[in-house]
Amino acid sequence: MYYKNFKTVTYCVAGWVNHITEEELREQADFLQKYVGIDKIYLETYRDEFAKKEKLDMFKRVMKDYGIEVSGGITTVTPDLNESDKKRQRLFNTFCYCNEPMRARLKEISEYTASQFDEFIIDDFFFTQCQCEDCIREKGERSWEEFRLEKMLEVSRNLIIGPAKKVNPKVHIIIKYPNWRESFAQTGYNPGQQPEIFDSIYTGTETRHGAQTDQHLPRYLSYSLMRYFESVAP
């Protein structure tokens, strides 16, 4: 560790992983280790596209040279998989979890990630606000909150945890919660039950300008969120 009381960790998105060369990576690693000191990185395997295996292998080899721990990451956003997906209401391209091709894609992502890493984190896009015809049909008479809480528990078990641990029984899976706690239930985040099925939990700790950015996050929010989740899963 470079610091006494905390680790420094960074997250590398799939598109960047696919395009950076080994020479560029070593140049950036030299700079970061000189001026910051990185203990660990999360290598994203999917965000709209898969990170290529040869790129992941290159990253892991280079990071080993620098003594940097490496884990995987997944961001659950995807482009339209067919023409019918254009009708779906998918904020930030998040998945529709009632759509079979998208469910199959998520299962494939989980299996691929578990085959590459013994630990991975699910970034804080693991939610749904889709109200397409498929979602309305499956929701039935339940409220959107009831439906989404149940749906995301099912997705967690059957499309992420189950498939990943079948490929790699020792894989450690972390769910990262976003910083907008007031909307958890409406979007399917379930901190009451998900910590029982995931191996670890984490939460976003970023802050932004209080008046000029889209989420209006106050400076003290990171502290309150960490305290909240310490109580959820002590």
Region annotations inferred by a language model:
Residues 17-20, 89-92, 134-143, 185, ...:
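Short, flexible/disordered intra-domain loops and linkers
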Residues 34-49, 89-146:
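Active-site groove signature of glycoside hydrolases
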Residues 1-3, 28-36, 50, 54-67, ...:
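Acidic (Asp/Glu)-rich catalytic clusters
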Residues 86-87, 163-225:
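Substrate-binding cleft/loops of secretory-pathway carbohydrate-active enzymes
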Residues 17-35, 99-113, 183-194, 222-226:
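Short, acidic/polar
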Residues 5-25, 56-116, 130-131, 158:
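Active-site-adjacent "subsite" loops/lids of carbohydrate-active enzymes
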Residues 1-18, 69-79, 121-124, 148-188, ...:
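Aromatic-lined carbohydrate-recognition surfaces of secreted/lumenal glycan-active proteins
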Residues 65-68, 92-99, 141-154, 195-209:
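Acidic, His- and aromatic-enriched active-site or binding-groove loops in soluble protein domains
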